[in-house]
Amino acid sequence: MKIYLIKSFGLKTIDKVIHKLESFELSEFSYGYCHYDLLPKNFHFDNKDNITFFDFDFLGKGYLVNDIMTFWIHLSLNATFNKMSQEEADHSFNILIKSYREIRQLSEDEIAAIPYLSFAFWIFYMGYHIEHFDDFSNTFFNQKFVIERVELIKTLTNKYCHFNT
């Protein structure tokens, strides 16, 4: 299955993503512990606007922008599936960035890296499904799922990743 994923994306796309990420000054990106899965299903606001985070199974060290990236994935999926317009997704993302910057620094390069980091996240997540087949993904991880997910990742990559050819 891993070979299929690599062939589906083509080594050229993977190389382009790696090259693009290497074009950033990654040593200047903020680094620390990341949740790595800040999708709406993994946090809750109570009636006093307190937030609770849960589902820490992907927790690890990395670039802090990865947490913003996972929320960006949520917005980009909603825009791609027409659950919201691209303008609404961009507006929501800009609110997140503005609010985040009120608390900590976030560079333009970190923001620009998000679509490429999301590609890496999708590859990781597909690997997660493979590695945890017996205890997690066996009910849905089949050929149809893989084909649909690969096509989705291709669509998102084509839409949001801008490679200098």
Each PLM stretch: what is its role?
Residues 37, 55:
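Conserved catalytic-loop position in the HRD/HxD motif
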Residues 32, 52-54:
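Protein kinase-like catalytic core scaffold
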Residues 1-36, 46:
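An alpha-helical support segment within catalytic cores of ATP-dependent transferases
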Residues 65-104, 121-136:
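Active-site activation/catalytic loop segments of kinase-like enzymes and analogous catalytic loops
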Residues 125-165:
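ATP/Mg2+ or Mg2+-diphosphate-binding catalytic cores
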Residues 46, 51, 59-61:
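Activation segment
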Residues 108-118:
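All-alpha amphipathic helical-bundle segments outside canonical DNA-binding/catalytic cores
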